[in-house]
């Protein structure tokens, strides 16, 4: 059915890494079964279990089957493609599929799938929901057999890949009803350059005097109050810093970058970097003051992020040599509010820190909690099987 189009796909100079979870095996088989597959596929991965997906992403997702998870998977796959062929970043892509298809066990939510593709120039997300025919209350609400759903998924995966490669993909009719929607974010040139590390940051100079690094997912009142207090204490304009890569978190795609920069726009300027660690941030912005929570400060001092005591000590010494300062805000931890007096950190790091008193700032709120609450609310309202 797809032989001619598969030949066109494999003739394209674009290549990438594909990762599947919960569905999409038929599309991968179609790609591998056509001559020339090595021209398109650098690697394929199937992190099927929850623990395998956590290992692939670097952290457990709030939901294994969601647009956000698919996009994170595609972003990680793109970085993997760049690691496999670092000289082909302009041609590389990461393609992901996460799906909850018809199964023989009870499952919450409708049968659905998400296909994401991320590359240097653009991020795509295709959302698919299998719809149920009208039925009597006593019917068990089928939305197609798994084989029928896999046929749809195969068509949609190859269709999105064809769209990315500017190849026309044929329409097809299926015996199962479904709805499909495709969204995309085209990246401006400065985002693209930071994404592939052609630039350290999309801004420099005065933008780096006082920086507030974070994931900002989502932005909340605590972030805004920290910024206001930091500006009052330092006399400097505080700029938000958003890194495409983050320690212990999946890398960002363009949907995430757009969403978070738009959230932050009303509250100040955002500097985009590809600097997950503070030593990398410091090399880009020497003599900067970083606005951080005490939980972040503790991570800066932890040996596990460096590999050895000597490497950690060398990094802290370099922070000192680069003139880095930290303005530290306390945070609730296991029922207690932590500040510098209650933690033990390296003397050289402590010497670079100024603590904001609890009487000046205390906000017992976190983006993690807000995301979890939002995910639970979404699950509670999702139609489909109990």
Where would I find each of the regions flagged by the language model?
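Nucleotidyltransferase catalytic core that binds NTPs
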Residues: 2-3, 8, 30-33, 51, ...
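Conserved active-site and cofactor/substrate-binding residues in soluble primary-metabolism enzymes
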Residues: 4, 22-26, 68, 72, ...
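Short active-site oxyanion
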Residues: 14-17, 268-269
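Hard-cation-handling environments
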Residues: 11
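Glycine-rich, small/polar surface segments that engage phosphate groups of diverse ligands
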Residues: 17-66
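Short, structured active-site "lid" loops
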Residues: 56-83, 257-272
């Amino acid at each position: 059915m797809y032989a001619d189009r598969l030949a066109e796909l494999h003739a394209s100079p674009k290549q990438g890494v594909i990762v599947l979870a919960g569905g999409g095996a038929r599309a991968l088989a179609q790609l591998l079964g056509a001559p020339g597959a090595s021209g398109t596929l650098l690697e394929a991965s199937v992190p099927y279990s929850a623990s395998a997906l956590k290992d692939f992403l670097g952290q457990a997702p709030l939901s294994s089957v969601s647009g956000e998870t698919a996009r994170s998977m595609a972003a990680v796959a793109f970085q993997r493609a760049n690691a496999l062929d670092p000289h082909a970043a302009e041609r590389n892509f990461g393609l992901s599929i996460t799906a909850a298809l018809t199964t023989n066990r009870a499952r919450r939510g409708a049968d659905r799938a998400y296909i994401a593709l991320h590359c240097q120039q653009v991020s795509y997300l295709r959302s698919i929901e299998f719809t149920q025919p009208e039925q009597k209350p006593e019917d068990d609400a089928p939305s197609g057999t798994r084989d029928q759903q896999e046929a749809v998924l195969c068509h949609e995966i190859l269709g999105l890949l064809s769209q990315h490669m500017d190849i026309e993909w044929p329409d097809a009719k299926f015996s199962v009803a479904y709805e499909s929607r495709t969204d995309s974010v085209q990246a401006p040139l400065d985002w693209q350059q930071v994404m592939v590390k052609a630039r350290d940051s999309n801004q420099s100079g005065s933008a780096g005097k006082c920086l507030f690094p974070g994931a900002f997912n989502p932005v909340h009142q605590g972030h805004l109050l920290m910024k206001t207090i930091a500006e009052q204490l330092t006399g400097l304009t505080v700029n938000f810093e958003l890194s495409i890569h983050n320690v212990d978190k999946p890398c960002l795609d363009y949907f995430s970058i757009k969403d978070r920069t738009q959230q932050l726009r009303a509250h100040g300027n955002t500097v985009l970097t590809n600097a997950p660690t503070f030593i990398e941030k410091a090399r880009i912005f020497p003599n900067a003051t970083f606005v951080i929570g005490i939980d972040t400060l503790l991570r800066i001092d932890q040996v596990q992020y460096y590999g050895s005591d000597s490497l950690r000590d060398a990094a802290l010494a370099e922070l000192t040599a680069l003139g880095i300062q930290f303005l530290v805000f306390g945070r609730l931890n296991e029922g207690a509010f932590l500040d510098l007096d209650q933690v033990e950190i390296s003397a050289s790091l402590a010497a670079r820190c100024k603590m904001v008193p609890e009487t000046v700032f205390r906000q017992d709120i976190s983006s993690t909690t807000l995301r979890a609450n939002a995910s639970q609310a979404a699950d509670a309202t999702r139609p489909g099987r109990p």
